[in-house]
Amino acid sequence: MKRIGLLTSGGDCQALNATMRGVVKGLSHNIDDLEVYGFMNGYKGLIYGDYRMLTAKDFSGILTRGGTILGTSRQPFKLMRTPDANGLDKVEAMKQNYHKLNLDCLVILGGNGTQKTANLLREEGLNIIHLPKTIDNDIWGTDMTFGFYSAVNIATDAIDCIHTTASSHNRVFIVEVMGHKVGWLTLYAGIASGADVILIPEIPYDIDKVVEAIERRKRNGSGFTILAVAEGAISKEDAQLPKKELKKKMEADSKIYPSVSYKVAKEIEDRTGMEIRVTVPGHTQRGGSPCPYDRVLSTRLGSAAAKLILNDEYGYMVGLINGKTKKVPLEECAGKLKMVTPDAQEIRDAKRIGISFGD
């Protein structure tokens, strides 16, 4: 007999349903007596006791369905120890609801903030398994997160579509890709779509170098240029500012520009006189069905999580390392970001074929 809880937290993405399906199938095909409880809308459901028992029917036909059948919400880790508006101790409430159902394990699907809370619950004595979800691919301890390649596909398609109109009108186009702190999504979508300039948070850009790349293409007979810009891209000047000054600068910029891409566009226009167009795919990058790669990855991660549960092994994240599913102790990975390093192989390969990173 196993009694488990499932919870999806943070921003939604593709393959959340597919991953939960992998967990449940991995258990139901190996034990006869299984109870599964789904906590609704992320940690809110665990805090306030909003849950329901799930059956095999709930997991039928969801391999290809985007979003999450459980709903999700954001519960910042830094506020987890702070009582709610009614004075409720959220951590104690989560523990009580876990024990109320007499769970053997709680399987938590989410990104970095979700993972930190998962580790907190582990420290509080609960049996926890975390599965790494994010389109940013920025979770330390795994080569790949589910949702990433689906988002790469969507962002790449968006840039591909811009290519045709950019070439027809001989214009400079900026496509803004999701990623506030890390640039994996922009990097991969930029390379996959043949972007000429890629700007990511980890490599502060020099706008003059960006303009130089555009002018070089014009001299070589290319009348259009495509820039893939992460929403967290930052200039070299801004990157050197102290945190408080940078925050003020960003607040001031936000009153002038809808996002960083519009700022980059204005800076290019001021230096070249060119007309720049900006396209923002936005939340479409998180939506839709998971791509085949993510369906396979999520099934493998879910199956590996089921194996840990069957063996009564808890306190781990299940990651993918060198093509193999691995268990990673939560205390080793919680709170760590996997950043793009300036000397990453992907960066070196991209530069070798002429892609500019504005540095």
Regions found by a protein language model. Give the residues of each.
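Short glycine-rich or small-residue beta-strand-to-loop segments that form or flank ligand, phosphate
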Residues: 3-11, 69-71, 104-108, 173-176
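Accessory alpha-helical/coil subdomains and C-terminal extensions
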Residues: 97, 108-110, 116-120, 148-167, ...
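Glycine-rich oxoanion-binding loops at beta->alpha junctions
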Residues: 48-106, 146-153, 157, 359
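Short, acidic/small-residue loops that bind anionic groups at enzyme active sites
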Residues: 30-31, 37, 121-145, 199-206
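N-terminal phosphate-binding or glycine-rich loops at protein starts, especially the Walker A/P-loop
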Residues: 1-50
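C-terminal non-catalytic interaction/assembly regions of soluble proteins
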Residues: 256-359
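Short glycine/serine/threonine-rich phosphate/pyrophosphate-binding segments
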Residues: 13-23, 46-47, 91-92, 103-119, ...
